């Protein structure tokens, strides 16, 4: 092949070598064996326009090649191609083809292309999966022929054949969607074995290895393809170990394993009424079908729902020649991250098992050893692994999750993908990689997910030293953070308890992908088996869920719903605390403390703030809330709900009730005079906390009945009689007058202030007295008064008149004049429709998206739970509209009102103050329609800041 390139091949030698990765060039002289098969593919890539342009070649004095490429690698048209091969330094795909090849397939192709040792294989595309689903869950026409053609390539590369006892070719069959879904879809290893093939394999590689591989295949194929519970195979294994008096699988002899194979084959007959299929080609077809089927499995669907993964065509299928980590003490398998996924520390973080296969580590079947043990027992393979990690991290410019196998001291790379990480890890990795000049700040902003920040805002233990006497066990610190909850033993119970508002600690011997719903619902996860890279650990870290894994001291009894630690018994419902940072298991409920911003997070958030256009405010009702908001980076208060201040003490609520029960304006004014100093004091505290930043104060909004006592009517009357000094008859009459059929659409918002102007007057007087008082103390106060529930311009005009009159009086009395704004909440659809009229009166609009959603859909927030889950399950709604803004309906009202309002008033400030202001996809929409700010709860402020930046980058 190379001779056909002759002259141009010699001329382009320097260009070819310059295209090799830097680390590969460094290793060239020391490892020619690994580079020989790499050179041809590197040569082809160097001639590809995407890699080296023609102008670059001309500038070097070299002539661009022409038809010379055809003998090396024929052009590939991917329009209808469904099977792509890779391995031995060449591939038909690359990392940019994730949507077609899935993440695993695209990265296998890429690793092959950059010269790493990847076992040859083929990838069946995600489009083929989509066709499979559309074809009644059967392989579409022609696909099997394409698979067979790809298999021929693998057989030629490996000089072996599927099903040939003299030259056996065991295969792995793995799933791989475009977005990583750890453990959610299926894998089959050692495919192609039967009695004849395993005998041939035994002759070549030893009987113990061959029959160990065979029993693993029978177990995995039976579970994944035939639907036989793994526990039925595990029972046979545990029974045999008990009979032999051994504890480890590795202590079983070849004869033991051969006997175990027969027991496993009997499981097929007992469980399914049919024998294990011995035809390797049939095994492959069934395995491909099973992987395609796993795309639509309940656990995969639930994982996609939890993580809001949509728009994917399906999973790819990766069929790859097997390499074996279970061929004795010179073999092994491992999983690693190029940096610590929990902390972000720049240090290899992983685990390794000698004489084992990959699923033993990933599935948590055996608790592995630290990666450092590999350096001692396999130094050459370890050195090469470290070099490969440097190559991959430099190539992808990200922290990578890598699976590898060592077969008789030779390293093979089985998978690489962008590594899942905790919030803490994500931020540190992003900051470090910017400092290392690997990425720029805009890339860093894209690398950290909003969910990562959510994790960082979770509490930690208040005083770890205080609970040391209650630590009963220590496992592996698989996912950091603190969790406190009641012990439960099934995923179903965890989901049920979560729905009931209970905090659950899910305790399992080991988690499986079927547990994904319960893992998401639980406050924390504790497992007896599994390492730092087990299913439980990887999934928990991705969600920021506290997890302690591999806690060997605990014994879990699911049937009795208990677990034991020595003589101690912990029952279902007992309180337990977990420290995912240290791995400690602690009895009882331990106190939690709010989180604090790290230096890395402050640096990262400063980049986000520089990038974003949208301002981020906070909804805060007390001075403490305001201080928290400011510490979290809020640029002001977008919603201060005055009514929340009324519940701060018994004296305040009693004064409110006197105001509500008042019969005459004079009585009402007496009660309001009692409330004024309370409101003024709170406003002073908020203005002080927000020195130099705007504070938007909403006038009283909720229906008055919300301030009355709860309980039966007699209790309410008695309590009000004590609070107000009124007679029972007077109170009964007043309560009857306050009663409403639909209070949320009744006597509330600006309707209160118009009916009782003295109510608006009291609140506004308190606001401006506090503003002037703080100004006199050197605080810069920027007050904004918001009138709620406006549906007509006349309503707003009325309240503005009252507000401006009170402001003028206060300024005259106190001798100070301040600038201020008066605006309104747009929460009634009619207000959005006539926004140009309202905009003429207002200084600002703030969309109250909670009520606007309620009134636009006609859904009562208090009752929507009765049918919302049904709507979501049936696809009638894609999201809860009270969490994610409805862009087609409510969103269009917001867009229209913004445009109309600004047409009437070009200086109109526009924002939103519903909880949608902290939801990332909603923030992106608000930025797109040109709002000036969003306002959300104090703890969601960093999330909104990042979401607003990610829209820009």
Swiss-Prot record:
Residues 55-74 are annotated as: Disordered. Disulfide bonds: none annotated. It is found in: Plastid, Chloroplast. It catalyses: pyruvate + phosphate + ATP = phosphoenolpyruvate + AMP + diphosphate + H(+). The lineage of its organism: Eukaryota, Viridiplantae, Streptophyta, Embryophyta, Tracheophyta. The keyword Electron transport does not apply. The N-terminal domain contains the ATP/Pi binding site, the central domain the pyrophosphate/phosphate carrier histidine, and the C-terminal domain the pyruvate binding site. Changing residue 869 to P: 60% activity in the cold. 60% activity in the cold. One of its GO terms (molecular function) is pyruvate, phosphate dikinase activity. This is Pyruvate, phosphate dikinase, chloroplastic. Phosphorylation of Thr-533 in the dark inactivates the enzyme. Dephosphorylation upon light stimulation reactivates the enzyme. Its EC number is 2.7.9.1. NCBIfam families: PRK05878.1 (NF004531), pyru_phos_dikin (TIGR01828). Formation of phosphoenolpyruvate, which is the primary acceptor of CO(2) in C4 and some Crassulacean acid metabolism plants. Substrate binds at residues 641, 698, 827, 848-851. It holds the Pfam family PPDK_N. One of its GO terms (cellular component) is chloroplast. Mg(2+) binds at residues 827, 851. The modification Phosphothreonine is found at residue 533. Pathway: Photosynthesis; C4 acid pathway. The active site is at 535 (tele-phosphohistidine intermediate), 913 (proton donor). Its main location: plastid.
